[in-house]
């Protein structure tokens, strides 16, 4: 009778089986919840005894057959959902299954290796024994991090600071789209810095500050695998992982290069939108600068067609080049090369005019100086002639006497007459001489 009650009311747990001693069904009208405490204790003892027999009985021992008793069979226990690797090592290539990555998209199915410098970051679960972050995992990328002010300062002190880890380090959000990967990797790098792993992050030249250890590489691989599901990775990331599924450092290095390229793209767009040209620099240098910017943007996936490029160039023209806005802006099929032909023509014309007119092209200040020098130069001419007069001419009375004698003596030689006429004649009114007839 006791065995029949055990078969009806005893619980089954964790691989232990309590089977009935008879194959006949026992029908009873007793309430299954109305069980005495003594019977419950007996059932628990029987269950404990069955568990102990399961663990102590070797696998090769023979179990006697009993037609009225079912032999206990150990139930297949699934592997722990959140437990780390037993050997504390990385997943092998066969376990990771790099071709299909069957476990990759399910963080709860991945064994997570603990890391001594950082806390564990498991998805929330009822049996987890590590710090949980239910409000952080899967949050949007725009959510600010509480430890945003804590940055990695000195990588050399990472070895001496093995035990002084922050109590709570916010993990990165879950990646939900390939387009969000550039923003996600920034938060992942911030997460590594807050976990005292800033020294292993590649710098601008692509090399880390210090060499990464095996444990750090394991931590890097597991965290990247958990928070970046494979279906949301960009194509270039999948290409890297298809060659080496643990090469997370190469992904970080390429991501930093792309960040720098994005910064260069932004600078090129700003430069192209704020172009200025007035002929002060050679047209060849201006053309080279603009074409290099357009080529870089086109190579990075930002396509600048001829119409947009010509509009941006013409908007920055000034001076004699400004009229190109109004002469060519209606040409729909104008190319950048055609626009620069016009710019070169104006620049060469400017250079030719400057080289051919260097002497008579004067400023207003030069003209003022020339006018002042002209008034002063006329006076020395007058002054230069006065000494010549005083030295070469006689007194006024002598010259007047010579004139009177020359008029009264017709027999004078022609040479003396011609000589006297060439000299300047000055008359004095005291001799009562008048040159104009009819004035006396």
UniProtKB/Swiss-Prot annotation:
Pfam families: TYA. Its main location: cytoplasm. Disulfide bonds: none annotated. Residues 1-93, 126-173, 352-440 are annotated as: Disordered. Residues 153-165, 402-418 have a biased composition (Low complexity). It comes from the Eukaryota. Induction: Ty1-PR3 is a weakly expressed element. Induced under amino acid starvation conditions by GCN4. Residues 299-401 are annotated as: RNA-binding. The keyword Transport does not apply. GO terms for biological process: viral translational frameshifting. One of its GO terms (molecular function) is RNA binding. It is found in: Cytoplasm. The modification Phosphoserine is found at residue 416. Residues 429-440 have a biased composition (Basic and acidic residues). Residues 1-23, 48-60, 127-152, 419-428 have a biased composition (Polar residues). Homotrimer. The C-terminal RNA-binding region of CA is sufficient for all its nucleocapsid-like chaperone activities. Retrotransposons are mobile genetic entities that are able to replicate via an RNA intermediate and a reverse transcription step. In contrast to retroviruses, retrotransposons are non-infectious, lack an envelope and remain intracellular. Ty1 retrotransposons belong to the copia elements (pseudoviridae). This is Transposon Ty1-PR3 Gag polyprotein. It comes from Saccharomyces cerevisiae (strain ATCC 204508 / S288c). The gene is TY1A-PR3.
């Amino acid at each position: 009778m006791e065995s029949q009650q055990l078969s009806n009311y005893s619980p089954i747990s964790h691989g232990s089986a309590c089977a009935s001693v008879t194959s006949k069904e026992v029908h009873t009208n007793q309430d299954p919840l109305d069980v005495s405490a003594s019977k419950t204790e007996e059932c628990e003892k029987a269950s404990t005894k069955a568990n102990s027999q399961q663990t102590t009985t070797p696998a090769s021992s023979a179990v006697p057959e009993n037609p009225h008793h079912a032999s206990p069979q150990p139930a297949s226990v699934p592997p722990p959902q959140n437990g780390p690797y037993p050997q504390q090592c990385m997943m092998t290539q066969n376990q990771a299954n790099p071709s299909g990555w069957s476990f990759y998209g399910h963080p709860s199915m991945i064994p997570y290796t603990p890391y001594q410098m950082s806390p564990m970051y498991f998805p929330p679960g009822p049996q987890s024994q590590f710090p949980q972050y239910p409000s952080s995992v899967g949050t949007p990328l725009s959510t600010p991090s509480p430890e945003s002010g804590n940055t990695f300062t000195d990588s050399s002190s990472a070895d001496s600071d093995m035990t002084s880890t922050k109590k709570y380090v916010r993990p990165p959000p879950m990646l939900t789209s390939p387009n969000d990967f550039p923003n996600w990797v920034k938060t992942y790098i911030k997460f590594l810095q807050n976990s005292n792993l800033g020294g292993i992050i590649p710098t601008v030249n692509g090399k880390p500050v210090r060499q990464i250890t095996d444990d750090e590489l394991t931590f890097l691989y597991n965290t990247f695998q958990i928070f970046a599901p494979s279906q949301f990775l960009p194509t270039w990331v999948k290409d890297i992982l298809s060659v080496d599924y643990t090469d997370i450092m190469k992904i970080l290095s390429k991501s930093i290069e792309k960040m720098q390229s994005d910064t260069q793209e932004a600078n090129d767009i700003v430069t192209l939108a704020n172009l200025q040209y007035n002929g002060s620099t050679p047209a060849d240098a201006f053309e080279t600068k603009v074409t290099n910017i357009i080529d870089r943007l086109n190579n990075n996936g930002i396509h600048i067609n001829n119409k947009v490029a010509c509009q941006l160039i013409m908007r920055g023209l000034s001076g004699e080049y400004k009229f190109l806005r109004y002469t060519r802006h209606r040409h729909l099929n104008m190319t950048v090369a055609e626009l620069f032909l016009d710019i070169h023509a104006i620049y060469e014309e400017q250079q030719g005019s400057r080289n051919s007119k260097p002497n008579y092209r004067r400023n207003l200040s030069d003209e003022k100086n020339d006018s002042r020098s002209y008034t002063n130069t006329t006076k020395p001419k007058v002054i230069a002639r006065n000494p010549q007069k005083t030295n070469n001419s006689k007194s006024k009375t002598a010259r007047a006497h010579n004139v009177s004698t020359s008029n009264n003596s017709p027999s004078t030689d022609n040479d003396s007459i011609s000589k006297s006429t060439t000299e300047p004649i000055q008359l004095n009114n005291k001799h009562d001489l008048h040159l104009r007839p009819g004035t006396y």
